[in-house]
Regions:
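The −1 position to Zn-ligating cysteines in a subset of zinc-ribbon hairpins
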Residues: 17, 21, 252, 305, ...
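Short, small/polar residue-rich loop motifs at catalytic or cofactor-binding pockets
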Residues: 253-257
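C-terminal accessory region of radical SAM enzymes
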Residues: 207-243, 267-317, 321, 326
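Canonical Radical SAM [4Fe-4S] cluster-binding loop centered on the CxxxCxxC motif
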Residues: 2-44
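Short microdomains enriched in Cys/His and/or Lys/Arg
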Residues: 43-50, 287-290, 326-339
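Short, acidic, Ser/Thr-enriched surface-loop or helix-capping motifs
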Residues: 262-263
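Short, basic/aromatic recognition patches
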Residues: 242-251
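Radical SAM/AdoMet-radical enzyme domain recognition
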Residues: 31, 39, 44-65, 72-190
Length: 339
């Protein structure tokens, strides 16, 4: 009998609601002509039951997002419960909270400090912020980085890099760090969700991906900070892997291995980018589509064109879920980066 083993980390998407309309958003329920089933959102009590079950199954660390997590009534109670239940088990790992910061306030930041929450806030460009999000709030995001710094809360600057904001990446990263961000997470734009309707205007060229890495290394070296690229890049797409000392690049997919995702209705997916539901938090077993889960859990997805590559054991050939979204199988090519 095939058994699905849950990773140690989970991302809880607490709500579908969002007060931005980001062109690059990869939430599967916002894809054009989406067939993704938006079920009724779990209540706060439901989420507490989910958290307890996950701890009992060996999950140790949590991140929470949406949609926009600050729009979920009672999200504070869920945070407290995660911390409380973790404490019973001797766990005090930071809870990562991902927000666009539009509804942020100082009381929330004080709460995050109290509960050992690591706050990640999105700044997809400065001059192009409104063009990307539909909202004019870049200065608002920078303000909350300042407040978090003053109150001693650790933060991450989250930048989705697109063709539209590529030219201002130096400025965007610099502003985030100057205003108090402790580190940086870069994500190259990936087709998925609402972003499928904006691929031509947002998708980076392979040359721009290398330029993104060069700019990130330059800014981080000046600031003496560290950063990460959160979306996989194939090794063969990078001109000089060895020169990057401050920006850390992911080459392998962590879906169903390092983490998994639970959507607002309790449905389980291998990653936040994926539209493929593999189970539900309240079902037994939780993972029902074992074959799809294990494709990711066991890294059984290398494209045929990469099978003879000497680097195949340390590179997943780009984002496997993009391959599935664009071409119908995680074993196909990630054409967002490999031409």
């Amino acid at each position: 009998m095939k058994i699905a083993h849950l990773p140690k980390s989970v991302a809880l998407e607490l709500t579908y609601r969002c007060n931005h309309k980001c062109k690059f958003c990869s939430c599967p329920w916002d894809a054009p002509t989406s067939a993704y089933p938006k079920g009724e959102e779990l209540t706060v009590c439901d989420w507490k039951k989910v958290v307890e079950v996950l701890y009992d199954k060996g999950v140790e660390s949590f991140s929470i997002s949406g949609g926009e997590v600050l729009l979920k009534d009672g999200f504070e109670s869920i945070l407290r419960f995660i911390r409380q239940e973790g404490g019973k088990r001797g766990l005090d790992l930071p809870i990562v909270l991902i927000s666009n910061a539009r509804k942020m306030n100082e009381d929330y930041i004080r709460l995050f400090k109290e509960l050992n929450v690591h706050l990640s806030m999105s700044l997809p460009g400065y001059d192009t912020f409104q063009e990307h999000t539909g909202v004019d709030n870049a200065d608002g995001v920078l303000h909350w980085f300042q407040v978090a710094k003053r109150l001693g809360l650790k933060t991450t600057l989250n930048v989705t890099v697109t063709k539209k904001n590529y030219g201002e990446l130096f400025q965007t990263m610099s502003l985030g760090l100057i205003n108090g961000a402790d580190d940086v997470l870069l994500n190259r734009f990936l087709p998925g969700g609402r972003g499928l309707a904006h691929m031509d205007e947002l998708m980076l060229t392979p040359s721009q991906v290398n330029g993104m890495l060069d700019v990130a290394e330059e800014v981080l070296s000046y600031a003496n900070k560290q950063g990460n690229v959160g979306t996989e890049v194939p090794l063969c797409a990078i001109k000089d892997v060895e020169k990057y000392k401050h920006i850390h690049i992911g080459y392998q997919c962590a879906a169903a291995k390092g983490f998994f995702v639970i959507d607002p209705a309790g449905n389980i997916r291998t990653c936040n980018h994926s539209p493929h539901i593999v189970g539900h938090a309240f079902r037994k077993p939780m993972i029902e589509d074992i074959d799809y889960w294990n494709t990711f859990a066991n890294s059984e997805y290398s494209p045929a064109m990469c099978s003879e590559c000497a680097m195949i054991k340390k590179c997943d050939c780009g984002c496997r879920e993009v391959a599935n979204i664009l071409h119908g199988s995680p074993k196909r090519i990630d054409s967002s980066i490999i031409i």
